[in-house]
Amino acid sequence: MKSMIEGVKKDGKKGRRNDRKDSWDKDGFTQRGRAEKKPVDLAKIQGIQGQIGIGKNKGDGNRLDCGMDKEEAEDGKDIMRCRHLSPGGGGMKRLLSEDVRETEGIGWESLGLGPVLLKRIRDIGYDFPSPVQVASIPHVLGGKNLLVRSKNGTGKTASYIVPMLNMINSSELSIQGIILVPIRELALQISRNVKRMSEGTGVISAPVVGGTSMQDDIIRVSNGVHVMVGTPGRIVDLVEKRVGTLSKRVILVFDEADKLLDVTFGETVTKLLDLLPREKQMLLYSATFPYFVTGFIRRYMKNPLCINLMKELAPVGVKQFYTYVKPSEKLLCLKSLLLRLSINQCVIFCNSIKTVELLAMKITEMGLPSYFIHSKMAQEDRNIVFHNFLKGKCKILVATDLITRGVDAPNTNYVINFDISKSPESYLHRIGRAGRFGAPGVAISLVTTEEKEMLMDIEAKLGKEISPLSDKGLSRLHESNIDRNQG
């Protein structure tokens, strides 16, 4: 990373700028930065469930029998079909890949949902449920504990929000549902989805996250809510203080379960489980489930049903490329990509906060306004940046892995790894930002010769070779104009 800045100099002097008085260290980085229900039609969904691997956890103590093995990914040719989908009710045309279209003939009416919620789904404009929704919703309604493995951007969120809303008794003003997520932005996003989906149902929800006023959260929850959406720490604080009334039976969702159960949050999560009523339904959702999750499942989940939809790890609609580049030429290579690609919106990932801040400045200097976001920013600033990016006020967002988990920016058609991911799991979640709900996208990684082994590790995990990006290939990408708003 040392000479990353060498490609862009001001007045012929490395690290000097005309418009600011920031000092630069020897590596060219700034020394400071800113920071009535219908019966479930099981016959209709039997076929899809037979394909995707639904079964109980064997619990042999050595591995989790929930699709840890994977098949070799297909090359992705001819997978795209034009489909009229209007998730916002706006009639937007999108290209959808087969991994979200294979349930197209199954209606929401077959899943056992009540009339109020079915009407709301129609009003929003969801044409048909995705495979993960078809596979899991009837089992959630049946009170099962679930472990669901599904690719990023395939509708996992609705697969638990919809049945949860259907099961909640709105006349009982108690906390009946808790949705745990690892990052604040995802909590706010899911909370908006719950509020939108629950319109007309009488269900009250509230986001509760760290970095915001605890007093405000206490007031909101004390006034009565049915669903809390938030990060583990803040939810534990509220439950410990006995804020709000807990129902005798709680539906507890782990979104991005692998992250919630790692060393970062594991202790807090287990504390929450001890505080909650013994009677609870637990739903775990993620694209990746490391082996350490097995111990948690054996201890806390009674007879969980495993649903695995991972025929391949990567989103089918995302084309993946890499290009070898010298560290000193990374910035120039990135500039060439940004100028030549037909970008709706793009997320550029870096491995450090310092690189994120500096790179955003450099991209803006190129005449391409960009935002940056990372965990050390004030929550208010993070909210503004993310909101503005979602609203399309800026095309380019430079970020750490903060936003790799479930965050949905539907107009993002390109992901660029300025720094290659430190782990295959991180890579998988990164590229998922460009393939939301089966839409097409492209992921490009800039790889130095020292990082070849990391690239090989990622390919081994995916079970697929990532294609090198040639100049001709780049031209083809430009000509193909991968646009999420066009069929």
Swiss-Prot record:
Signal peptide: none
GO CC annotations, alphabetized: P-body
Highest rank taxon of the organism: Eukaryota
One Gene Ontology biological process: mRNA processing
Catalytic activity entry: ATP + H2O = ADP + phosphate + H(+)
Transmembrane segments: none
UniProt family annotation: Belongs to the DEAD box helicase family. DDX6/DHH1 subfamily.
Free-text comment on this protein's domains from its UniProt entry: The Q motif is unique to and characteristic of the DEAD box family of RNA helicases and controls ATP binding and hydrolysis.
PANTHER family according to UniProt: DEAD-BOX ATP-DEPENDENT RNA HELICASE 50
Protein name from the UniProt record: ATP-dependent RNA helicase DHH1
Organism: Encephalitozoon cuniculi (strain GB-M1)
Gene encoding the protein: DHH1
